[in-house]
Amino acid sequence: MSILPLIAANMCIASWGVAYMNVIVIGGVRDVYKRQTTDFTWVTGSQYIYSFDKCFFMPADFTGGLEYNQDNLTDDMWGYNRYTKQEVRIASAFFQNEWKNKQWSFLLGGRLDKHNMVDHVIFSPRANLRYNPTENMNLRASYSFGFRAPQAFDEDLHIENVGGTVSMIELAKDLTEEKSQSLSISGDLYHRWGDFQGNLLIEGFYTLLSDVFALRQIGERDGIIINERYNEKGAKVYGLTLEGKIAYRSLLQLQAGVTMQKAEYKQARAWSDDETVPMEKKMFRTPDTYGYFTLSYNPFVPMTIALSGTYTGSMMVEHKAGFIDKDIAVNTPDFFELNLKAGYDFNLYKGITMQVNAGVHNIFNAYQSDFVRGAKRDSGYIYGPGMPRSYFAGVKLSF
């Protein structure tokens, strides 16, 4: 048995800061406030790898390591006495061993995390099995466990502020981490027909969530709405994904995929502070069907034409009262967003390439049609494609 060790250490330091001012006019009164958000994150870690010619019954790779992550965030809204300071520290150790040959692979591993907002160490196991009955068939089964730690800051607070609502989040005394368990089974098929080659992936997935995070309004303090983050029973997401790819030489390539899923809570939950609003079991902003496709055509080497599209099925979205009289759950229409891009490459000098491109985003202008306006609008009532039909042109240099 031979052991080939590899030691890797890395450190990444990043900082980000943003400051901006909003002006709100409510009932003829002009209210100006400033808000500053700063976030500083740094990560360091090391990794150690052993490669075994044979570990018990077949060759294997062992990976182990340590990681430390710290994030310091402050969010200060001047004039509203809303100041949030959140410090997150995560110390982690991870390990896995993968036995593999051409036909089989078995992976067993886990991760230990100590989060400063959780009073115990969290163990997250994972396992993966691969079997290749033939060279053109790949079968996989995998299991993983994950968690999301409590946090008091939520970017949605900024969205609400745009609409004139000022709120803060407090953590419930008995709040615990949100946990997930995921299982997936897939089959990957490859085939070649003369100048054509294709690939088909079929995957079924099931994710079970427990102690799901939720928010409820518990009061008001100095004009600021106080929301409490607490744990609900749980939820599940399950479905099927189909993906395919076919290519003809280097001339034409088509790739497409579709996912059909169900995402729902174990029990119907109250999402509105108005007790007369019906509870919902279905997860908001999770369509039952969504998909994509990309078609690339290379009529000659320097030129590429790409047609792409995304489909988003109907989903349920919250529309809060203000502009409307009462909170309602809206079933959105489905959207198909089609894009076209053409590019031409010019070889400038010794490996330096310049590409000139142009195209159209969202050709059919599939876009939300019921935007609301005014001081009482729900600023979070936004769904669908991010922009209407738009035209673009660009230049890219590659070295």
Q: Where on the chain are the PLM-derived regions?
A:
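Transmembrane beta-barrel strands of outer-membrane/channel proteins
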Residues: C12-W16, G64-Q70, L108-L112, A127, ...
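Face-selective signature of the C-terminal outer-membrane beta-barrel domain
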Residues: M1, A9-G17, R30-D119, G198-G204, ...
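Gram-negative outer-membrane beta-barrel transporters
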Residues: K100-S105, G204-L208, E228-K320
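Structural signature of Gram-negative outer-membrane beta-barrels, strongest in the C-terminal barrel
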Residues: P59, N81-L208, S296
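C-terminal beta-signal and adjacent terminal beta-strands/loops
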Residues: T312-K320, Y344-F399
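Residues that define the transmembrane beta-barrel architecture of outer-membrane proteins
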Residues: T38-W42, E87-A91, V121-F123, K179-L183, ...
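Outer-membrane beta-barrel strand-turn architecture
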Residues: Y50-F56, E98-Q103, F123, Y131-E135, ...
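Membrane-embedded beta-barrel scaffold of Gram-negative outer-membrane proteins
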Residues: I13-W16, R140, D174-Y230, K236-Y238, ...
